[in-house]
A protein has these predicted regions:
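Catalytic core of membrane glycerolipid acyltransferases/transacylases, capturing the structured
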Residues: 1-54
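Non-catalytic C-terminal accessory region of glycerolipid acyltransferases
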Residues: 58-174
Length: 174
């Protein structure tokens, strides 16, 4: 589970941790329309275009089954790229997938060595992973277990915050 600032973020995560492994990469429709090369890369790495509609329940069910069999899922649970350097709250869907698949969640953050912290050509990049969060932490009574989802969101946000300042690049002048 990663916070995202750029459409290129999945590339760095895949290269830094999962190179050579097949994985499922959830991405919004817009991610697959940015650049033909990125689209090709995401598709080769197991990219799945998710529009957030109810018609995609089969995709979610297939993903849960694949995770139960040991596949890795890369998802950016905020559902959008953040623009101001702030951590956005994760959306609930990720917690439903994690709970039903019974898989641990590994928090992740990406930092760019630029004045505004956004990706730029040839800038330094730091990908930081937190400790795995046990699947039991995301267990739910049902898909609408609001109390469990709130607790999961809080725990993931806190994990992202812990991966912040000690690992971020020192601020630069614009």
């Amino acid at each position: 589970m990663a916070g995202t600032t750029s459409a290129i973020d999945p590339v760095f995560i895949i290269i830094s941790r999962f190179w050579g492994k097949r994985m499922i990469v959830f991405g919004k429709k817009e991610l697959f329309e940015i650049n033909p090369l990125l689209t090709w890369f995401f598709r080769c790495m197991g990219g799945v275009c998710v529009r957030g509609t109810r018609e995609e329940l089969a995709v979610i069910d297939n993903t849960i089954a694949a995770c139960k069999e040991g596949d890795t899922l890369l998802i950016f649970p905020e559902g959008t790229r953040e623009r101001e350097g702030k951590i956005l709250p994760p959306k609930s869907g990720m917690f439903v997938v994690a709970a039903q698949a019974g898989v641990d969640v590994v928090p992740c953050r990406i930092f760019y060595d630029t004045p505004n912290g956004r990706a730029k050509l040839f800038c330094r990049v730091r990908v930081v992973y937190g400790e795995p969060m046990p699947a039991a932490q995301f267990a739910m009574q049902d898909k609408r277990d609001v109390k469990a989802m709130r607790a999961g969101k809080k725990a993931l946000t806190e994990a992202w915050e812990q991966l912040g300042e000690p690992y971020a690049f020192a601020p630069k002048d614009a």
